Amino acid sequence: MAYAALASARLGHRSAAIFGADKIAAGAAEIDLLRSAGVEVHIVPLEQGPIFENVEKDHGRVQTCIEPGEPVPVVDVPNVWRAAPAWLVVPVSNETGPEWAAAIPPDARLVLGWQGLLRKLVAGTETGRKAPTRGPLVDRADLIGVSRGDLGKGTGLDELNKLLRPGTRLVLTDGIHGGLAFEATTRGPANEVTYDSIPSRQVDSTGAGDVFLAALVAAWLDRGAPTEEPGPTSADLRWAAAAGALAVEGVGLPGVPDRAAVIARLADIDHEGQKRHGSDCSRSEDRPDRH
């Protein structure tokens, strides 16, 4: 949740965050960083929060569950928070139970990061993977984000579509291969939009998916898109991909980019594309005509 909340704030949106935290986590420097960025923080006291150990290896990240933590109960929040146009639910250890689906105001967009509901967690063992299933949060969600790496091999769009209520949009990310978005319908996936990845120099991938999702919501809100729109658009996805690419180039929460950084990265990419196009045209014009 911390990455999504900070990304929302740094991308220019008023942001509030509800955290379940034990005494140690509640006093962490990351909480101060959120507050300094303008995020309004509500900490729900827990006896034990989740703890993971991440180790990057040649074949990818290996994550070990040190402590799975405990559920975060639904809490009362200020009325101004309840008026927010979008709520991001991004659990890390299945800590947001089904009761959270009913707690989100009915006229707000519910955006779900599916990853945290798909982890099989046993203290002292490597994090496992659960098959995606339906549930109150999935049924309530207007937009769901998930990585191919969080799904079993061979999980196809038709299979995912069957788990979603008609009208829900799902974004399926695939790292350097880009990704796609589609709208769930009774006839199968519809309104599919693909996007390319943004080149990056990866240092730390922690939280990149949450930053991507928060940036996607920010783009959606910036143009006043209605909830019934079969988005997100290719421009929304490109913006989110740039934010996610920047996030992996830093270390930890301080690496979350701001709006200016995303704009600059996209401008650099456009400039490089124009240079390549111009070079290709020049080479074409230099070739002698052959008759």
Descriptions of predicted regions:
Residues 1-10:
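Histidine-anchored nucleotide/phosphate-binding helix
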Residues 6, 52-55, 178-182:
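Short beta-strand scaffold segments in enzyme catalytic cores
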Residues 10-95, 100-112, 265-281, 287-291:
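Conserved N-terminal subdomain of the carbohydrate kinase-like
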Residues 23, 120-128, 225-229:
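Short, flexible/disordered intra-domain loops and linkers
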Residues 52-53, 119-125, 202-207:
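Short, charged, surface-exposed secondary-structure boundary motifs
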Residues 77, 134, 202:
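Acidic, amphipathic alpha-helical patches
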Residues 86-161, 176-178, 184-185:
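Conserved beta-alpha-beta core of the PfkB/ribokinase-like small-molecule kinase fold
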Residues 157-291:
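Conserved phosphate-binding/catalytic region of the ribokinase-like
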